[in-house]
């Protein structure tokens, strides 16, 4: 519905009577007068004005007024006859401003949200259907939405004389048209919702309705086509017996694996070919990502019993990221007796490949390569890094700075926003030789008309969506579904969809020879990588020309599986004796990886080499993006922290950390409704982290705490997060960890927001009543020394390998 309001009601100052004196008998009659501010003009006025709320039964609406410009006939007679302004010549129309009312639902019951699908267009909420279809899985199932949509609004033909449901023929026609539009959008935008082999009940239900209500219509043809497509896809998956990954052309079978001499074949592939093939694989996987799998409420369920197979498209992307990282490590460390200058050549080649990925706007493989080169087994090779050419070192610094964690990874976010939909990358390098080569390569691509898509680092979006899910409540007053939260989530999902569309610009061809070589690369565990690294350069090897220490500024994509805070200590520059192994069974290049098989905690409790974990774990507690990581719900069987023995020694300025929690690149810390930060009480709310005592405090869950929350409610929410629904909340007590020697037991009926200590970290424990308190395991935020060897043993046992 469009409602019209006097334009004067929207002016920034109160209207006053205006008089116009005209001397003489002649002149032009004044038909319309609009007062103007002497200081500002119309271009400074806001075209949208908040008008308040409208509350109905089961729904709350936000109402805004928007000024729109329309063309009307200048002649009164033409207006009276209903002539449309856009069909008249330019000289016969006048521009006028109209005010339209926009009603957007802020919260409501599921029934009202489904009903709004039919009325949103009339309320001028033009994006509602896309937002609902992209986010409804967080609060409803496909079957429940279909039941409400088709049974309640699609059965008018069966009604007989009931005015409450059976309206006029025109109304039925309008409802049928709206249903057709919704179903067509659903089938086009979310075909995965109907992937329910072998019977496909939801899709058959849609087909049954369309055959009865709209036979031969476009939505019906689309539904029939989708059914055939899903059946063919299911038959192919049954033949390969491997699910998602085996249908990828770069996932070769075991019989296709061949042993290849590593170094010879690595140098036999041109740098641009390697980057092109990595981009081909990443683009194929990213285009298959189902955007709603990234929602925090869905992604956080992956570790529950019924969620082991959830988000397969995200898992496939993470597995590919780890495979690239492992490939970088294996090519450098596999030749155990390699000389430093030869090892430096391999590193320089990977830096060149990373730059080629940058030219192709493949930020996923770019980050994987940089992350691997910054991992401890490679970063500790001081003599090797001393042999790397200065120009390559400078280029590596520039590529690393793209993923600087300062200001919530602002550099990478701005770069992604700037180049997300551009045809080519915008390169600016201080390394002269690389700059000339890159510009030449880029100019060649432009001359050939080969446009580039954009492959983002998916972890940024997962972090933002998880933070949104943690900070904003699912329900508001009266138990209504908080749909405003879904609008905020859709802002992030829309960016993912936009970049997926941009990936269609790539025109790449797979190279089977490269795939065979890539598939044949071993994936070393952190333990194995460190052993090989020590064989290349021993513990006592030092180079007088080693670059200055530099903190790693890149966290791997697999850190998104971390729900633990582990230990946040600063890293020393010196190396320390390595702890003896205790049976690590890792499959990745280091302890931060993802494998395609499940493992129990007992299988992944092995010891890994440890060092200062400042570069990764301090950032987990101090950088805002990593604050988002704290909110991820994970289990200890799928968590791991990247740890190593010595800080790499590349030059660069020290990292400065600043607290901010920008949820999307468009949000600012001062925007209204900004979610609270960890360790900060603001606007009567804060985020606390609750772990189980029997879990050694390693696995925590982030909880939104308000000034109204009492102890029993907080305990119940924490138990739900930790999958303890079957136990009684009265059997547990809430304890805040103050220091290694002190803790604060929150009283049973206290207001936790005011009872907690704000001078300590907001870290809490769930403890069974009557149990003896264990020694407090703190996640230090300021230690600058390496833990002793015996302390490292207990730390390593707390870090389990990431598996799917």
UniProtKB/Swiss-Prot annotation:
Residues 564-611, 640-676 are annotated as: Disordered. GO terms for molecular function: guanyl-nucleotide exchange factor activity. Residues 684-771 form the Ras-associating domain. Residues 270-539 form the Ras-GEF domain. Residues 101-231 form the N-terminal Ras-GEF domain. Residues 661-671 have a biased composition (Polar residues). Residues 581-607, 640-649 have a biased composition (Low complexity). Keywords: Guanine-nucleotide releasing factor. Probable guanine nucleotide exchange factor. This is Ral guanine nucleotide dissociation stimulator-like 1. It comes from Danio rerio (Zebrafish).
